Amino acid sequence: MRESQHNGPEPRLGLTFSENPDGTVSWHQPVSDQFVDPSGRFATGGLAVLVDSGLGAENHRRRPSGKWTVTTELRLDLIGAPREGSTGLGIRADHLGHDGHCLTTRGEVVDDDGEVIASGLVKTMEFAAGVDAEGYDDEPPWPSALEPGTLAEVLCLTLSERGDGDGGRVVEGVIAPEPTLANPLGNLHGGVFAAAAEVVGAAVFSHERDVSSSALDVRYVRQIPLVQPVRVRAEVLHDGRSWGISQVTTRDERGRVCAVATVTVYGRR
Protein backbone atom coordinates (compact mmCIF):
# COMPACT_ATOMS: atom_id res chain seq x y z
CA MET A 1 0.00 0.00 0.00
CA ARG A 2 1.38 3.39 -0.97
CA GLU A 3 1.98 6.04 1.65
CA SER A 4 -0.14 9.16 1.81
CA GLN A 5 1.37 12.37 0.46
CA HIS A 6 -1.26 14.55 2.10
CA ASN A 7 0.20 17.29 4.29
CA GLY A 8 -2.80 19.57 4.79
CA PRO A 9 -4.47 20.96 7.89
CA GLU A 10 -6.01 17.62 8.89
CA PRO A 11 -2.73 15.92 9.89
CA ARG A 12 -1.48 19.27 11.22
CA LEU A 13 -4.39 19.21 13.71
CA GLY A 14 -3.88 15.51 14.40
CA LEU A 15 -6.91 14.37 12.39
CA THR A 16 -6.75 10.87 10.96
CA PHE A 17 -9.26 8.61 9.24
CA SER A 18 -9.70 4.89 8.67
CA GLU A 19 -11.90 2.95 6.28
CA ASN A 20 -14.32 0.44 7.80
CA PRO A 21 -15.27 -2.94 6.28
CA ASP A 22 -18.80 -1.66 5.56
CA GLY A 23 -17.43 1.18 3.42
CA THR A 24 -17.94 3.93 5.97
CA VAL A 25 -15.12 6.14 7.21
CA SER A 26 -14.15 6.82 10.83
CA TRP A 27 -12.44 10.06 11.84
CA HIS A 28 -10.38 10.75 14.94
CA GLN A 29 -9.02 13.96 16.42
CA PRO A 30 -6.98 14.02 19.63
CA VAL A 31 -7.98 16.37 22.43
CA SER A 32 -4.90 18.45 23.03
CA ASP A 33 -3.71 22.06 23.17
CA GLN A 34 -5.23 22.80 19.75
CA PHE A 35 -8.52 23.11 21.65
CA VAL A 36 -7.28 26.03 23.75
CA ASP A 37 -8.22 29.54 22.64
CA PRO A 38 -6.20 32.71 23.42
CA SER A 39 -8.18 33.27 26.64
CA GLY A 40 -7.48 29.74 27.88
CA ARG A 41 -11.02 28.47 27.23
CA PHE A 42 -12.07 25.42 25.22
CA ALA A 43 -11.85 26.58 21.59
CA THR A 44 -15.01 25.67 19.69
CA GLY A 45 -13.15 26.48 16.48
CA GLY A 46 -10.89 23.50 17.11
CA LEU A 47 -13.76 21.33 15.83
CA ALA A 48 -14.12 23.14 12.51
CA VAL A 49 -11.66 21.16 10.38
CA LEU A 50 -13.05 17.87 11.74
CA VAL A 51 -16.60 18.93 10.81
CA ASP A 52 -15.61 20.35 7.42
CA SER A 53 -13.48 17.36 6.43
CA GLY A 54 -15.57 14.61 8.04
CA LEU A 55 -18.97 15.79 6.82
CA GLY A 56 -17.63 17.28 3.60
CA ALA A 57 -16.09 13.92 2.69
CA GLU A 58 -19.55 12.34 2.78
CA ASN A 59 -20.72 14.87 0.22
CA HIS A 60 -17.55 14.57 -1.85
CA ARG A 61 -17.80 10.79 -2.25
CA ARG A 62 -21.32 11.20 -3.73
CA ARG A 63 -20.42 13.82 -6.34
CA PRO A 64 -20.83 13.13 -10.09
CA SER A 65 -17.87 11.57 -11.89
CA GLY A 66 -15.20 14.05 -12.96
CA LYS A 67 -16.41 16.74 -10.58
CA TRP A 68 -14.78 18.35 -7.55
CA THR A 69 -16.62 19.75 -4.54
CA VAL A 70 -16.18 22.86 -2.43
CA THR A 71 -17.82 23.74 0.86
CA THR A 72 -20.32 26.59 0.56
CA GLU A 73 -21.86 26.50 4.05
CA LEU A 74 -20.72 25.17 7.41
CA ARG A 75 -22.67 25.20 10.66
CA LEU A 76 -21.27 24.15 14.05
CA ASP A 77 -23.20 24.17 17.34
CA LEU A 78 -21.37 23.34 20.55
CA ILE A 79 -23.29 21.43 23.21
CA GLY A 80 -20.45 21.16 25.71
CA ALA A 81 -16.71 20.74 25.99
CA PRO A 82 -15.36 17.17 26.16
CA ARG A 83 -15.27 15.72 29.66
CA GLU A 84 -12.04 16.09 31.57
CA GLY A 85 -9.72 13.26 30.60
CA SER A 86 -11.27 12.73 27.17
CA THR A 87 -8.51 11.86 24.73
CA GLY A 88 -10.17 11.83 21.33
CA LEU A 89 -13.14 12.90 19.24
CA GLY A 90 -14.95 11.27 16.34
CA ILE A 91 -17.81 12.15 14.05
CA ARG A 92 -21.09 10.47 13.13
CA ALA A 93 -22.33 11.52 9.70
CA ASP A 94 -25.80 11.44 8.16
CA HIS A 95 -25.91 12.32 4.46
CA LEU A 96 -29.21 14.07 3.72
CA GLY A 97 -29.13 14.24 -0.06
CA HIS A 98 -28.69 16.46 -3.12
CA ASP A 99 -31.18 19.20 -4.04
CA GLY A 100 -29.78 19.70 -7.53
CA HIS A 101 -27.45 22.44 -6.37
CA CYS A 102 -25.84 21.31 -3.11
CA LEU A 103 -25.01 18.06 -1.36
CA THR A 104 -25.83 18.23 2.36
CA THR A 105 -24.56 16.17 5.29
CA ARG A 106 -25.23 16.70 8.97
CA GLY A 107 -23.51 15.00 11.85
CA GLU A 108 -22.47 14.87 15.47
CA VAL A 109 -19.07 15.23 17.09
CA VAL A 110 -18.69 12.64 19.84
CA ASP A 111 -16.09 12.09 22.54
CA ASP A 112 -14.46 8.76 23.34
CA ASP A 113 -17.46 7.83 25.53
CA GLY A 114 -19.82 8.36 22.62
CA GLU A 115 -21.29 11.50 24.18
CA VAL A 116 -22.34 14.20 21.72
CA ILE A 117 -20.43 17.45 22.25
CA ALA A 118 -21.43 19.30 19.06
CA SER A 119 -23.57 19.09 15.95
CA GLY A 120 -22.58 20.19 12.49
CA LEU A 121 -23.85 20.62 8.94
CA VAL A 122 -21.91 21.03 5.70
CA LYS A 123 -23.23 21.95 2.25
CA THR A 124 -21.04 21.57 -0.82
CA MET A 125 -21.35 22.36 -4.52
CA GLU A 126 -19.72 20.39 -7.30
CA PHE A 127 -17.90 21.95 -10.23
CA ALA A 128 -15.64 20.95 -13.11
CA ALA A 129 -12.39 19.85 -11.49
CA GLY A 130 -9.08 21.55 -12.13
CA VAL A 131 -7.33 18.66 -10.41
CA ASP A 132 -7.29 14.88 -10.73
CA ALA A 133 -10.60 14.43 -8.93
CA GLU A 134 -10.59 10.64 -8.97
CA GLY A 135 -6.94 10.50 -7.93
CA TYR A 136 -7.73 12.11 -4.60
CA ASP A 137 -10.37 9.45 -3.93
CA ASP A 138 -7.57 6.89 -3.66
CA GLU A 139 -5.63 8.85 -1.03
CA PRO A 140 -4.63 6.34 1.67
CA PRO A 141 -4.96 7.21 5.37
CA TRP A 142 -2.30 9.65 6.51
CA PRO A 143 -0.45 9.61 9.83
CA SER A 144 -1.06 12.28 12.44
CA ALA A 145 1.41 15.16 12.29
CA LEU A 146 -0.04 17.11 15.20
CA GLU A 147 1.58 20.52 15.46
CA PRO A 148 2.17 21.51 19.09
CA GLY A 149 0.54 24.66 20.39
CA THR A 150 -2.81 26.33 20.97
CA LEU A 151 -5.36 26.63 18.20
CA ALA A 152 -4.15 30.09 17.15
CA GLU A 153 -0.56 28.84 17.07
CA VAL A 154 -1.43 25.78 14.98
CA LEU A 155 -3.36 28.03 12.57
CA CYS A 156 -0.41 30.48 12.37
CA LEU A 157 -2.91 33.11 13.51
CA THR A 158 -2.00 36.34 15.28
CA LEU A 159 -4.60 38.68 16.79
CA SER A 160 -4.72 42.42 17.33
CA GLU A 161 -7.38 44.79 18.62
CA ARG A 162 -8.14 47.72 16.35
CA GLY A 163 -10.37 49.83 18.58
CA ASP A 164 -14.10 50.32 18.22
CA GLY A 165 -16.08 49.77 15.06
CA ASP A 166 -19.67 50.77 14.39
CA GLY A 167 -20.98 48.18 16.85
CA GLY A 168 -18.17 48.12 19.37
CA ARG A 169 -14.87 46.30 19.66
CA VAL A 170 -13.03 45.14 16.53
CA VAL A 171 -10.46 42.33 16.47
CA GLU A 172 -8.32 41.48 13.46
CA GLY A 173 -6.41 38.30 12.81
CA VAL A 174 -3.71 37.45 10.30
CA ILE A 175 -3.14 33.89 9.06
CA ALA A 176 0.39 33.37 7.78
CA PRO A 177 0.64 31.69 4.33
CA GLU A 178 1.65 28.31 5.74
CA PRO A 179 1.37 25.68 2.94
CA THR A 180 -0.06 23.00 5.24
CA LEU A 181 -3.13 25.19 5.83
CA ALA A 182 -4.13 24.89 2.16
CA ASN A 183 -6.72 22.70 0.47
CA PRO A 184 -5.79 20.50 -2.53
CA LEU A 185 -6.35 23.48 -4.86
CA GLY A 186 -3.79 25.58 -2.98
CA ASN A 187 -6.24 27.98 -1.35
CA LEU A 188 -6.95 28.37 2.36
CA HIS A 189 -8.80 25.29 3.61
CA GLY A 190 -12.42 26.09 4.45
CA GLY A 191 -12.16 24.43 7.85
CA VAL A 192 -9.11 26.56 8.65
CA PHE A 193 -10.99 29.76 7.88
CA ALA A 194 -13.90 28.54 10.02
CA ALA A 195 -11.55 27.78 12.92
CA ALA A 196 -9.80 31.14 12.61
CA ALA A 197 -13.12 32.97 12.29
CA GLU A 198 -14.29 31.43 15.55
CA VAL A 199 -11.09 32.42 17.37
CA VAL A 200 -11.23 36.00 16.10
CA GLY A 201 -15.01 36.33 16.44
CA ALA A 202 -15.03 35.05 20.02
CA ALA A 203 -12.17 37.38 20.97
CA VAL A 204 -14.40 40.46 20.74
CA PHE A 205 -16.33 39.31 23.83
CA SER A 206 -15.42 38.68 27.45
CA HIS A 207 -17.56 36.26 29.47
CA GLU A 208 -17.33 33.75 32.30
CA ARG A 209 -18.08 30.51 30.43
CA ASP A 210 -15.41 27.85 30.00
CA VAL A 211 -16.00 27.60 26.23
CA SER A 212 -15.05 30.23 23.67
CA SER A 213 -18.41 30.30 21.88
CA SER A 214 -21.61 28.34 21.29
CA ALA A 215 -22.22 28.54 17.55
CA LEU A 216 -20.38 29.16 14.30
CA ASP A 217 -22.09 29.75 10.94
CA VAL A 218 -19.95 30.20 7.81
CA ARG A 219 -20.70 31.08 4.17
CA TYR A 220 -17.94 30.68 1.58
CA VAL A 221 -18.34 33.13 -1.30
CA ARG A 222 -15.15 32.53 -3.28
CA GLN A 223 -11.72 30.93 -2.89
CA ILE A 224 -9.44 32.44 -0.23
CA PRO A 225 -5.95 32.84 -1.76
CA LEU A 226 -3.08 31.69 0.45
CA VAL A 227 -0.25 33.27 -1.54
CA GLN A 228 0.02 36.00 1.08
CA PRO A 229 -1.20 36.54 4.66
CA VAL A 230 -4.97 36.21 5.04
CA ARG A 231 -6.63 38.96 7.07
CA VAL A 232 -9.69 38.14 9.14
CA ARG A 233 -11.78 40.92 10.73
CA ALA A 234 -14.41 40.51 13.45
CA GLU A 235 -16.79 43.17 14.71
CA VAL A 236 -19.75 43.18 17.06
CA LEU A 237 -23.31 42.83 15.78
CA HIS A 238 -24.83 42.50 19.26
CA ASP A 239 -23.22 42.71 22.69
CA GLY A 240 -25.85 42.11 25.37
CA ARG A 241 -25.65 41.15 29.00
CA SER A 242 -26.32 37.47 28.32
CA TRP A 243 -25.16 36.84 24.78
CA GLY A 244 -23.42 38.38 21.81
CA ILE A 245 -23.02 37.96 18.06
CA SER A 246 -20.02 38.94 15.98
CA GLN A 247 -19.52 38.98 12.23
CA VAL A 248 -16.25 37.83 10.73
CA THR A 249 -15.11 38.48 7.16
CA THR A 250 -12.09 37.95 4.98
CA ARG A 251 -11.48 39.70 1.66
CA ASP A 252 -9.17 39.24 -1.30
CA GLU A 253 -6.68 41.81 -2.59
CA ARG A 254 -9.46 43.47 -4.61
CA GLY A 255 -11.58 43.99 -1.52
CA ARG A 256 -14.14 41.34 -2.42
CA VAL A 257 -15.62 39.25 0.39
CA CYS A 258 -14.31 35.68 0.22
CA ALA A 259 -16.08 34.31 3.29
CA VAL A 260 -18.31 35.56 6.07
CA ALA A 261 -19.11 33.98 9.43
CA THR A 262 -21.18 34.71 12.50
CA VAL A 263 -20.04 33.66 15.96
CA THR A 264 -22.54 33.42 18.82
CA VAL A 265 -21.35 33.66 22.42
CA TYR A 266 -23.50 33.06 25.50
CA GLY A 267 -22.41 34.07 28.97
CA ARG A 268 -22.67 37.08 31.24
CA ARG A 269 -19.92 39.65 31.04
Segments (PLM) and residue ranges:
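Non-catalytic linker/capping segments at the edges of enzyme domains
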Residues: 1-34, 122-180
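Residue-level preference for beta-strand/loop junctions
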Residues: 9, 21-23, 68-70, 87, ...
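Hot-dog-fold acyl-thioester-processing enzymes
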Residues: 9-12, 23-59, 172-202
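Intrinsic-disorder/low-complexity, polar/charged segments enriched in Ser/Thr/Lys/Arg/Asp/Glu/Gln
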Residues: 24-26, 73, 88-90, 104, ...
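Preference for bulky hydrophobic residues occupying beta-strand positions
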Residues: 29, 76-77, 107, 173-175, ...
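Hydrophobic beta-strand-centered segment that forms part of the acyl-chain substrate-binding groove
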Residues: 39-42, 55-90, 201-231
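HotDog/MaoC-like acyl-thioester-processing domains
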Residues: 57, 80-90, 94-146, 224-227, ...
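Structured core of small recognition/catalytic domains
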Residues: 172-242, 246-257
